[in-house]
């Protein structure tokens, strides 16, 4: 009977060691999965940052050319406004004098189509 209980003890110890090995293997597997997941996330993040950087560069190139056109149009508009202001200042007095002359200088005349019935 002692040999039987000794055999049972050996089986129990072997089962315990096997369970420990299985448990240790599961822990290693979980660590490897976790590490692989972290590496994959880091790689995805790096790729996303690279693509975002490329997008920003293309966006800046596209908007940069559009921005220079806008600046050019604004500059041209300011130049034209300056010219118009200069013309206005030069001709203002003359136009006002002519306008006042036409309004204030009234010469009554009989229209040529008017007939005197007599």
From Swiss-Prot:
Brain, heart, kidney and spleen. The keyword Cell membrane applies. GO terms for cellular component: apical plasma membrane; cytosol; lysosomal membrane; plasma membrane; synaptic vesicle membrane; vacuolar proton-transporting V-type ATPase, V1 domain. It comes from the Eukaryota. The modification N-acetylalanine is found at residue 2. Its main location: membrane. Residues 19-42 are annotated as: Disordered. It is found in: Apical cell membrane. GO terms for molecular function: ATP hydrolysis activity; ATPase binding; proton-transporting ATPase activity, rotational mechanism. Keywords: Acetylation, Cell membrane, Hydrogen ion transport, Ion transport, Membrane, Transport. GO terms for biological process: cellular response to increased oxygen levels; intracellular iron ion homeostasis; synaptic vesicle lumen acidification. The keyword Coiled coil does not apply. Belongs to the V-ATPase G subunit family. V-ATPase is a heteromultimeric enzyme made up of two complexes: the ATP-hydrolytic V1 complex and the proton translocation V0 complex. The V1 complex consists of three catalytic AB heterodimers that form a heterohexamer, three peripheral stalks each consisting of EG heterodimers, one central rotor including subunits D and F, and the regulatory subunits C and H. The proton translocation complex V0 consists of the proton transport subunit a, a ring of proteolipid subunits c9c'', rotary subunit d, subunits e and f, and the accessory subunits ATP6AP1/Ac45 and ATP6AP2/PRR. Subunit of the V1 complex of vacuolar(H+)-ATPase (V-ATPase), a multisubunit enzyme composed of a peripheral complex (V1) that hydrolyzes ATP and a membrane integral complex (V0) that translocates protons. V-ATPase is responsible for acidifying and maintaining the pH of intracellular compartments and in some cell types, is targeted to the plasma membrane, where it is responsible for acidifying the extracellular environment. This is V-type proton ATPase subunit G 1. It comes from Bos taurus. The lineage of its organism: Eukaryota, Metazoa, Chordata, Craniata, Vertebrata.
């Amino acid at each position: 009977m002692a040999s039987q209980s000794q055999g049972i003890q050996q089986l129990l110890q072997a089962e315990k060691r096997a369970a420990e090995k299985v448990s240790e293997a599961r822990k290693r597997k979980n660590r490897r999965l976790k590490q692989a997941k972290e590496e994959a996330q880091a790689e995805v993040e790096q790729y996303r940052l690279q693509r975002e950087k490329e997008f920003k560069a293309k966006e800046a190139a596209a908007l940069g050319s559009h921005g220079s056109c806008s600046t050019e149009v604004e500059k041209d508009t300011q130049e034209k406004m300056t010219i118009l202001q200069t013309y206005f200042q030069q001709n203002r007095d003359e136009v006002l004098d002519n306008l006042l002359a036409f309004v204030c200088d009234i010469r009554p005349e009989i229209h040529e189509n008017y007939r005197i019935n007599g």
